[in-house]
Design a protein with these regions (language model features):
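Acyl-donor binding region in acyl/amide transferases
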Residues: 64-145, 304-309, 318
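A conserved beta-strand-loop-helix scaffold within acyl/acetyltransferase catalytic domains
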Residues: 3-64, 135-146, 156-318
Length: 318
């Protein structure tokens, strides 16, 4: 049993054996970090010839020494010697001149439902396992400490086919998707020379959410490092297309209203149809309001596709 440095190939072999892994612990991320000026090393705990725990460790000079970090790691196929790994990692950091060693484990401390209510107990041993070895705990944080969130929203997709995806959404989510489909929103995958569009979105978001944004060249380096394993996506809206969608859907609504009015001429006392007519008439008026808004945007933007939102999708085997 031993704590050792391993090759990139050995790390990748072990990484394929674990059930959970963040993109932060991938060969692509190591390539990106090296491009950004970090020193990279692959370390592991071995039992015999078998790696049980491994991690990408990256370092950056600070006054008087190095700052060393394991982000979203280590990864492990067995937790039996996880404490041994953490202890040896301290020794490794000290031997290599690190003044600060930061570990951000990729373990779930507690699970909450969509309403913010806990549905699992706190896994306090995840913290004590490190503090018992002399590590300091920064506390459970909110927001974007260090430019990244500690809270992750995870949707379980196992067993869900594409045709059933919307059915799995919440009561609030289903009508929002239905409404969005009437807008004529289009998705676009950005090319490398279009990443300034993505940067404009992240800059605006970071100002609004009060966290530090990455630079444009960081996103370009990310694009280069991850290749087909990452997509920079944006949602766009052409307001003329949006107006045309509104016109089409309002016309369908008008046909339903005309039919209801004809039915009420035959059966004017039908309370059910009267209620339906009131509801559809209200929806019809809403379309008029939305068309007025769309017209104002057409006057401003013409036929231009306007970017509404963007997101970076990163793919890992796990």
């Amino acid at each position: 049993m031993s704590f050792i440095q391993v090759t990139k190939e050995e790390f990748n072999t072990h990484a394929q054996q674990v059930s959970e892994r963040s993109f932060m612990q991938t060969e692509e991320m190591a390539k990106l970090l090296e491009k950004r000026g970090f020193s990279i090393s692959y370390v592991a705990w071995k039992e015999g010839n078998q790696i049980e725990v491994s991690a990408i460790v990256y370092s950056m000079p600070m006054t008087g020494g190095l700052r060393m970090e394991v982000n979203c790691g280590p990864i492990h196929s067995s937790v039996a010697h996880l404490s041994d790994f953490y202890q040896c990692l301290k020794d490794y950091a000290k031997a290599n001149g690190a003044l600060e060693l930061v570990i951000k484990p990729y373990d779930t401390y507690q699970i909450f439902d969509s309403n913010g209510e806990p549905i699992s107990s706190e896994q306090k041993q995840l913290i004590s396992q490190l503090t018992d070895l002399g590590y300091s705990f920064d506390g459970l944080q909110t927001g974007y400490p260090g430019g990244e969130p500690d809270w992750h929203y995870v949707k379980e997709l196992s067993g869900i086919e594409e045709k059933d995806l919307i059915k799995s959404f919440s009561k609030k989510g289903k009508p929002l998707v239905k409404k969005a489909k009437t807008f004529g929103i289009k998705l676009k995958k950005l090319k490398r020379d279009e990443l300034s569009i993505f940067k404009e979105i992240t800059s605006a978001t970071s100002d609004r959410r009060e966290y530090s944004d990455k630079s444009l060249d960081y996103y370009q380096d990310f694009y280069d490092a991850f290749g087909d394993n990452a997509d920079f996506m944006v949602a766009t809206l052409n307001f003329q297309d949006y107006f045309d969608h509104l016109e089409s859907n309002q016309a369908k609504l008008r046909a339903r209203i005309v039919k209801l009015q004809a039915d009420l001429e035959t059966n004017p006392k039908s309370e059910k149809k009267q209620n339906q007519l009131r509801e559809l008439s209200s929806q019809f008026e809403t379309f008029d309001v939305r068309k007025g808004e769309a017209t104002a945007f057409i006057d401003k933007y013409g036929q231009e596709d306007i970017v509404l939102a963007g997101s970076l999708f990163v793919y890992t085997p796990q």
